[in-house]
Regions:
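Alpha-helical, largely C-terminal catalytic domains
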Residues: 1-180
Length: 180
């Protein structure tokens, strides 16, 4: 994926009064994202690695989190790429019911202390992410994160079910769902 020149022209034309900030460890973050993705078998080819680089995920995360310590920056980067992989999976899933079942496996991987190496790579990866999150987040933050995580999966399932049924909700319905 490459970004078209017209995109950069539009971005450069925006008058942004704040100084641009970027975490200084963007290259390190990209290497961490790729290494973690390989470790969890989320990428197997150089083409897939190139795709991750082309998405500029590390740059996005580094720009949005310019002041964080490396471990927390890494955790945010890994969660970000994990959600991209989950979204890609929906292009190949056989049914909404299969996706709902998969979401239940994801949720169990974040609440049960068992090894998930025999399951789908996204399941073992989310278990790893949840363990890492516990190192940096207290119990209240974990509960809030989990609640937001469940809501995100619910919205994901709703959007996929709409797409599968070829339903395009109006703006008010879409906004109401995203707020609930």
């Amino acid at each position: 994926m490459t970004i078209e020149p017209w995109y950069w022209q539009a971005i450069e034309a925006i008058d942004y009064p704040f100084p641009q900030r970027m975490h200084p460890d963007i290259d390190w973050l990209e290497r961490e994202i790729i290494a973690w993705s390989r470790t969890h078998h989320l990428v197997q080819s150089q083409e897939q690695i190139n795709h991750i680089r082309a998405m500029l995920l590390a740059e996005f995360v580094a720009r949005a989190n310019a002041d964080l310590r490396r471990p927390v920056l890494r955790l945010i980067g890994l969660w970000t790429v994990w959600f991209f992989f989950l979204d890609d999976l929906t292009d190949t899933i056989s049914s909404v019911e299969s996706l709902a079942d998969f979401h239940l496996h994801i949720l169990s991987a974040t609440t049960e202390s068992i090894t998930h190496t025999q399951e789908h790579p996204l399941i073992s990866a989310v278990a790893d992410l949840w363990d890492e999150l516990r190192q940096y987040a207290g119990p209240i933050t974990q509960v809030r994160f989990y609640r937001a995580f469940v809501q995100t999966l619910e919205a994901h399932l709703w959007e996929v079910s709409n797409r599968t049924a070829r339903v395009q909700p109006d703006s008010a319905t879409y906004t109401a769902m995203r707020r609930s």
